[in-house]
């Protein structure tokens, strides 16, 4: 498409229109499918900045040129990998790049993070184009933000005649500048995430315990945990980071689904075994409700939980089935080999209880896991000052979760940052907001790199590919044009099929964002 006029660079689309005359005012456009806001206040400052540091910027954007061409090749390979025969592979690849799975449910707050991140990353992208053009002596005509149908975007407008007069190498520096700036911005986000614990260390502890940021009303933990609570352990295993929380939940769920009596190595000297029991006094058992057998299942009334004798080797088992209050039982001494141990002890001693007690375990159905969650209330100043000295604190609590552990672990929002007691009454969510903002900005910026590297029409990839083909001097103009058309048609078709597969057909659910 060759029309005299200026070229507009944008991360979504590119148009060329008639050249502006010197006294013509820039007017905003609005229609049923497109509207924009044009801004020309930054023309002179950006142009002066680009001309002042022209030499340095040309070196900087020459590096970006190499990155842009390499990105075009790598993104094409990524595009082809989307048609990998293994759906799980494609799903993980998409999640790694975009930060979410196609079937992921995005919350309202997540949408807000995406919108803010989009504004920031598009600004960085267009600033790259504007500075690169200024270093070549080309002043932009205006900056614009727009919405085309439902897709937001941004652009900078240049005089197309001046762009066409540039050597292909110089033009490539301008075309690759946007994705180069987005790539550098991704690196800055990663660096900021890495330094975040150090920067926030005067005000927040990091990696000691998990702090609850939010418990949605649909979460099974709603009513048990509150924002600001500190999760100490899951089934007796101390957790320090959200990733450890999810990993441990997956390990416990996997172990529960196994039918053998083997043990699972958790790292270090910790091992997980089968059979979680409690030493229950015989007097409490005799006072308990006996329950009823309904369709070969032991049923208890109300909120009572069914318990039975733990099967132990070399032990004189007294068969007992009784209904007890789980809130009272979890406070008792533990027995059985289903708890975390520091060594491989003799299984014969796992069921040993004090005289007058029996080792009982809760009856569980397949797919339902009995899990203890230990937490600390931090709503009072006294609890906050006690820190991790849980043994002397009456702020420590334990409750039992019975159900789908994987769904439960994803239903609550956690952070590894714990406010120091002076900041416990405000700013609890601040580290989480920073962390999510940086993470979301990283993924959006990376997505812009990939989108604008695609060999498709109306994106930066088209201009990069077109200028790159100009370097092949042995090809005639006709062959260059033909090669460009073949690459763009093929790239556009592959991109459409890939995104249709990713976002419309969907793939297996990965996680909640």
Curated annotation (Swiss-Prot):
Which residues does Zn(2+) bind?
125, 129
For this protein, the Enzyme Commission number is 3.4.24.-
Positions in the Cytoplasmic compartment: 1-60, 129-137, 204-437, 507-513
Q: What does this protein do?
A: Metalloprotease that catalyzes the second step (site-2 cleavage) in the proteolytic activation of various factors, after site-1 cleavage. Part of a regulated intramembrane proteolysis (RIP) cascade. After ER stress, cleaves BZIP17 and BZIP28 proteins which function as stress sensors and transducers in ER stress signaling pathway. The N-terminal bZIP component is translocated to the nucleus, where it activates the expression and production of ER chaperones, as well as proteins involved in brassinosteroid (BR) signaling, which is required for stress acclimation and growth.
Cofactor(s), by name: Zn(2+)
Q: Which organism is it from?
A: Arabidopsis thaliana
Entry's transmembrane regions:
61-81, 108-128, 138-158, 183-203, 438-458, 486-506
Query: Which Gene Ontology terms of cellular component type are present?
Result: Golgi membrane
Give me the Lumenal side stretches, as residue ranges.
Answer: 82-107, 159-182, 459-485
Which residues participate directly in catalysis?
126
Descriptive protein name: Membrane-bound transcription factor site-2 protease homolog
On tissue specificity, the annotation reads: Expressed in the vasculature of roots, cotyledons and leaves.
Sorted alphabetically, which InterPro entries does this protein's record hold? MBTPS2, Peptidase_M50
Please name the taxonomic classification of the source: Eukaryota, Viridiplantae, Streptophyta, Embryophyta, Tracheophyta
Task: Describe the inactivation phenotype.
Answer: Short root and increased root branching. Mutant plants have increased sensitivity to salt-induced osmotic stress and tunicamycin.
Say which family it is in: Belongs to the peptidase M50A family.
Among the GO molecular function terms of this UniProt record, one is:
metalloendopeptidase activity
Q: Which GO terms describe its biological process?
A: cellular hyperosmotic salinity response; proteolysis; regulation of brassinosteroid mediated signaling pathway; regulation of response to endoplasmic reticulum stress; response to salt stress
């Amino acid at each position: 498409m060759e029309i005299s006029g200026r070229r507009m660079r944008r991360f979504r689309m590119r148009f060329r229109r008639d050249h502006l005359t010197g006294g013509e005012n820039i007017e905003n456009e609005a229609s049923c499918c497109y509207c924009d806001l044009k801004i020309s206040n930054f023309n002179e400052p950006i142009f002066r900045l680009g001309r002042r540091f022209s030499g340095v910027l040309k070196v900087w954007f020459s590096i970006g040129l190499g990155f842009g061409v390499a990105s075009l090749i790598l993104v094409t390979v990524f595009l082809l990998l989307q048609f990998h025969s293994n759906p799980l592979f494609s799903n993980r690849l998409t999640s790694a790049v975009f930060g979410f799975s196609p079937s992921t449910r995005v919350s309202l707050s997540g949408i807000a993070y995406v919108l803010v991140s989009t504004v920031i990353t598009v600004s960085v992208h267009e600033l790259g184009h504007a500075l690169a053009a200024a270093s070549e002596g080309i002043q932009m005509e205006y900056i614009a933000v727009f919405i085309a149908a439902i897709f937001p975007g941004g652009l900078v407008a240049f005089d197309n005649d001046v762009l066409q007069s540039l050597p292909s190498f110089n033009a490539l520096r301008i075309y690759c500048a946007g994705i180069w700036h987005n790539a550098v911005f991704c690196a800055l986000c990663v660096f900021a995430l890495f330094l975040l614990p150090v920067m926030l260390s005067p005000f927040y502890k990091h990696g000691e315990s998990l702090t609850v940021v939010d418990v949605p009303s649909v979460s099974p933990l709603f009513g048990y945990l509150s924002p600001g609570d500190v999760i100490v352990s899951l089934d007796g295993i101390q957790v320090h980071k959200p990733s450890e929380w999810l990993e441990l939940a997956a390990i416990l769920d996997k172990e529960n689904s196994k039918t053998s009596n083997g043990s699972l190595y958790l790292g270090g000297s910790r091992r997980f075994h089968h059979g979680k029991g409690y030493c229950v006094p015989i007097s409490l058992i005799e006072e308990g409700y006996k329950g009823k057998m309904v369709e070969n299942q032991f049923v208890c009334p109300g909120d009572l939980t069914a318990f039975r004798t733990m099967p132990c080797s070399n032990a004189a088992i007294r068969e007992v089935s009784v209904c007890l209050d789980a809130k009272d039982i979890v406070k008792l001494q533990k027995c059985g080999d289903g708890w975390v141990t520091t060594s491989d002890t003799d299984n014969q001693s796992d069921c040993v209880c004090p005289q007058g007690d029996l080792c009982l375990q809760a009856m569980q159905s397949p797919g339902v896991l009995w899990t203890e969650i230990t937490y600390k209330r931090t709503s009072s100043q006294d609890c906050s000052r006690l820190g991790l000295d849980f043994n002397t604190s009456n702020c420590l609590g334990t409750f039992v979760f019975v159900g789908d552990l994987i769904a439960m672990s994803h239903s609550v929002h956690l952070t590894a940052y714990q406010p120091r007691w002076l900041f416990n009454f405000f700013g609890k969510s601040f580290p989480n907001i920073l962390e999510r903002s940086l993470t979301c900005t990283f993924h959006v910026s990376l997505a812009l790199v990939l989108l604008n590297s695609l060999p498709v029409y109306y994106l930066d990839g088209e201009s990069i590919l077109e200028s790159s083909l100009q370097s092949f001097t042995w090809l005639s103009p006709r062959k260059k044009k033909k090669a460009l058309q073949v690459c763009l048609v093929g790239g556009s078709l592959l991109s459409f099929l890939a995104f249709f597969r990713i976002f419309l057909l969907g793939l297996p659910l990965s996680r909640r964002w």
